[in-house]
Amino acid sequence: MYSSSRKRCPQTKWALKLLTAAFLAASPAAKSAVNNAYDALIIEARKGNTQPALSWFALKSALSNNQIADWLQIALWAGQDKQVITVYNRYRHQQLPARGYAAVAVAYRNLQQWQNSLTLWQKALSLEPQNKDYQRGQILTLADAGHYDTALVKLKQLNSGAPDKANLLAEAYIYKLAGRHQDELR
């Protein structure tokens, strides 16, 4: 290798260090390490250890839409409904994946803010109209809000495709809320 016998000024050394760091950060190995660390946080959160991921998100200023959705889901898993709504309000103008909107819908439902929840269920369903979990979430929220007949109609539509145990439980829940105890046992 060639080496220069002349000394570099501090600004040149600083610029070279910065350039080297930028090249290293852009390398596939560096990106892989960052992705592996992020994936490890998500895996831990799925196991129930949500605090490391929540702390990581709180320290970041620039997040992708998928990372925002991850934050919303993990905060929901942690039972932090108010944090879910705070994060959503901060990033509400982003185009989030459906799972992000669904997490916020559940948080609003948990806080008994039915109309806000229904609005978010509709947003999630506009992105994934065939998602049965989102359809059921909307149906249960309609029932919580006292719209029993609408909830039952939507549930019957969902059941027409393929009835399942979750739908039977949802139906019993709706009948119970509506005070129709004889129907909840069918």
Where are these regions (language model features)?
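N-terminal leader/linker segments that initiate helical-solenoid repeat arrays
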Residues: 23-86, 95, 99
